[in-house]
Amino acid sequence: MRVRNRKGAGEMLAENAHIVVENPADFKGSWSERFGNDHPIHIEVGCGKGAFITGMAALHPEINYIAIDMQLSVLSYALDKAIEADLPNVQMMLVDGAALSEYFADGEIDQVYLNFSDPWPKGRHEKRRLTYKSFLATYEKILRPEGEIHFKTDNRGLFEYSLVSLANYGMELKKVWLDLHQDEEFAPQNVMTEYEQKFSQKGQVIYRLEAKFLPKK
């Protein structure tokens, strides 16, 4: 998600260091101490303006959430929502999702969310896709054994690519939705991103999958 530079975004993040972690590498292996409890930790890589992560945190106080984005202005809007909702189980990081192993110890994370990631449609940009094998290797490293990835997109090409990429990596596809909002059972519990709200109202099909890493043989 690309947004215009927001005046004062940097100062806003700095003034809310209790939510936005200034030096996240300092907490590698000790994120439970940062949260003050030993609840499961879920991360969203590319959090956008924060509707999903704050919505999930409000619904699941028994889970700790970390919102990750590399765009300063975007993260500042997510911070707005976290402050307004006064959620003790949300932290935020202004970092590149490709470097997650610098900030989390092996097996420290319970679940990864990838929502409406940049599809990078050109073949020469394949390695930038968040479901490319190098990213999957990073997720596997920081996730607990049999940890899961939950992925949503409106881009059919990226979804098809991701299905193949995850399968080739050896992951188990637990569930696949080819039209998420038509699932009467799941739709009521689906927490949407801002992007999803906008485009689903226009009739755009939303794809979703849940996959888990399997023990190495």
Curated annotation (Swiss-Prot):
Superkingdom to which the source organism belongs: Bacteria
PANTHER family in the record: 3-DEOXY-D-MANNO-OCTULOSONIC-ACID TRANSFERASE/TRNA GUANINE-N 7 - -METHYLTRANSFERASE, PENTACOTRIPEPTIDE-REPEAT REGION OF PRORP DOMAIN-CONTAINING PROTEIN
Gene: trmB
Protein's name according to its UniProt entry: tRNA (guanine-N(7)-)-methyltransferase
Entry annotation: catalytic residues: D118
Region (Interaction with RNA): 124-129
Chain positions recorded as substrate binding sites: K122, D154, T193, E194, Y195, E196
GO terms under cellular component: tRNA methyltransferase complex
General function of this protein: Catalyzes the formation of N(7)-methylguanine at position 46 (m7G46) in tRNA.
Family affiliation: Belongs to the class I-like SAM-binding methyltransferase superfamily. TrmB family.
PROSITE patterns: SAM_MT_TRMB
Catalyzed chemical reaction(s): guanosine(46) in tRNA + S-adenosyl-L-methionine = N(7)-methylguanosine(46) in tRNA + S-adenosyl-L-homocysteine
Gene3D superfamilies: Vaccinia Virus protein VP39
Annotated pathway: tRNA modification; N(7)-methylguanine-tRNA biosynthesis
Transport keyword on record: no
MF term (GO), any: tRNA (guanine(46)-N7)-methyltransferase activity
EC number: 2.1.1.33
